[in-house]
Structure formats: C-alpha cells, structure tokens
C-alpha cells in the first residue's frame, strides 16, 4: 500500500493563523520603531509627571563637553580682581611626559614589579610635538636615556645627569603646576604667592608694575624664575624669566636653557576649575614658541592643606653620601 501524501491544503489555515497573530503582536507591542506601546507610554508619562523638579532637570540636562565650559564669572577679591585663592592640582600624566606617551616598565621590574612603571597618557602640548632644534632634540634623547642616573663626583657635575625631580630639585616652571602634588595660591593686591607641596617650592608673582622698588628684570637666575603678573579681564597673566637651566619639563628629558621665557594664563572657568595655559619660548632650544594647556582642579576635601614634603632628606645620602664621615656602603 502506498504511503498517503500529506494534505498541504489543510496546513494553509494554520499558517495564516500564525502569521496573523505575529502581525497582531508586532503592531500591539511596537507600532512604531523606537516607541513603547500605548499602555507603556501612558505609564511612562505618569512617571514623568511624578518626577521632582530636580529629577526632571537631571533627565533633560546635557552632558558637558570636555574642554568647554559655560559662561562663568569668578568671585572677586576686595580689590575687584578674580579670586583664585585655594589649593589646586592637575590630574594629568604630564610630569612623566608632556607629549603623548605609551606605558613603560620601570627600572628593575624583577625587583620592583609595577612600582616605578610609567602609565600611558595623553600629552598637554598643543599640536602634539615640541618644536626642537635638531641638536636640542639629540640632547633631549640623551637626557631620557640618562634620566635615572645620579653619578655625583663634584658640585661641578651634579646637574649633568638624571631627572632633577629624582634629586629633589625645585621643579621649575611650568612643571611645578602639573606634578602629582597640590599647590596653593595665596592672593594679595600687590603680589601673589604660590606654594608648591613638592620640595617646598615657592613663587612670588609681583602684581604692581609701577612699584619702582621691584626690579623689572630678574636680579639673578633662579630655579622658579622671576615672575610679574597682571589681569586681563578674568585671566591672570604671569610672565616669568630668569631661570636656571637645570630643570626639566618632565621625566622624558624635555628641557630648556637659561633663555627660557614662560607666559602663563590662569582662567577660572567654574568654582572648581582653572584652565591653565603656558606659552614657552627658548630660542636656544626650540625653533618657535609652543603652548601647553590643561585644567586645574580645586581640592575640596574638608581640612585640605599642603603637607610637609621632606624630599631633601630622602636624597642626602644619594647626593652627598660620599662626603659623609661614615659613608654608607
């Protein structure tokens, strides 16, 4: 007996029924792409109506765009100038390298593990590259290779090798502003003091250009330079020169000569942020002026203050142990 063939005509109503149900569910659940069903929309509307004003504002608020701030007028000091008083800190990796940099292992990873390793990070140099002269770029590369060397044989050579930070030297400008330590701005009408936690560094910015008792030119080269300032609207402009040539911009060996000239701009753009810019000029090292920029953040911890950083005590044996009556072996 031959096997009976399936009656496909009988299957047609079932197929049509399944198709119709699928279309019904599709239209009911999602009548328009991106919209909830009517009942769900009604529930959502009820929930929206029940929101507090704060919740409603948060739901419609735009996320901030990095690098952009809404208009802001900083509070004023008694003499009408923008009030920059406070403790500030940068949160960038520029102290490692002011240009874009990859992560690197630290010295002796077999002993130190991850301690001393360099994290990767974005640079703060506008345009991405420092415009070195060819011979100066070769010196920068030599600095990078010798950044961990501290081979002191006499005071005549103590600046020749090693990152100055390694030896706890005063960091210089602008490096002091982006090291991983806070600093405090203490603002007065005729001068501004900036105290840095690292190496107990200090700067005085003279604000009264008409005061004839204050030299208009640096009386001597110093680690932090000679600084004069003025306000341009809400921006503090600080002009510094008269630097010793011994500081670096970072651990990567970026450096300058004693012809360094730095113009800094501090603009408070919110109660908690200062946008910092520095234009750097040194005709002995660079082919043209160049600029760096980054935000500074107000430290808001209760009772925040600078702490004593006895950096010198950490390196006395390293630098001068050979002169000790009982040198360590």
Give the positions of each predicted feature.
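PEST-like low-complexity, intrinsically disordered acidic/proline/serine-rich tracts
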Residues: 2-3, 13-329
């Amino acid at each position: 007996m031959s096997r009976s063939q399936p009656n496909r005509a009988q299957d047609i109503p079932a197929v049509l029924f399944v198709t119709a149900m699928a279309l019904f569910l599709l239209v009911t659940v999602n009548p328009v792409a991106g919209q909830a069903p009517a009942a769900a929309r009604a529930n959502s509307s009820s929930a929206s109506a029940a929101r507090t004003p704060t919740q409603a504002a948060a739901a419609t608020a735009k996320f901030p765009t990095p690098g952009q701030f809404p208009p802001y007028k900083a509070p004023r000091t008694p003499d009408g100038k923008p009030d920059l008083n406070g403790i500030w800190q940068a949160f960038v990796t520029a102290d490692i390298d002011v240009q874009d940099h990859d992560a690197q292992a630290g010295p002796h990873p077999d002993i130190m593990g991850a301690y001393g390793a360099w994290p990767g990070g974005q640079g703060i140099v506008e345009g991405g590259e420092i415009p070195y002269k060819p011979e100066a770029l070769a010196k920068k590369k030599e600095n990078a290779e010798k950044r961990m060397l501290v081979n002191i044989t006499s005071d005549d050579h103590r600046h020749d090798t090693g990152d100055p930070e390694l030896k706890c030297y005063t960091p210089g400008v602008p490096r002091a502003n982006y090291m991983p330590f806070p600093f405090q701005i203490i603002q007065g009408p005729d001068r501004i003091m900036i105290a840095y936690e690292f190496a107990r560094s200090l700067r005085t910015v003279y604000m009264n250009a008409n005061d004839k008792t204050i030299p208009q030119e640096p009386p001597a080269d110093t680690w932090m330079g000679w600084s004069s300032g003025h306000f341009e609207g809400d921006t503090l402009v600080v002009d510094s020169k008269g630097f010793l040539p011994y500081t670096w911009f970072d651990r990567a060996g970026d450096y300058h000569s004693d012809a360094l000239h730095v113009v800094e701009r501090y603009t408070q753009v919110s109660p908690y942020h200062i946008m910092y810019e520095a234009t750097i000029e040194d005709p002995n090292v660079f082919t043209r002026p160049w600029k760096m920029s980054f935000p500074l953040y107000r430290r808001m911890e209760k009772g925040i203050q600078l702490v004593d950083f006895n950096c010198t005590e950490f390196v006395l044996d390293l630098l001068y142990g050979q002169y000790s009556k009982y040198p360590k072996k």
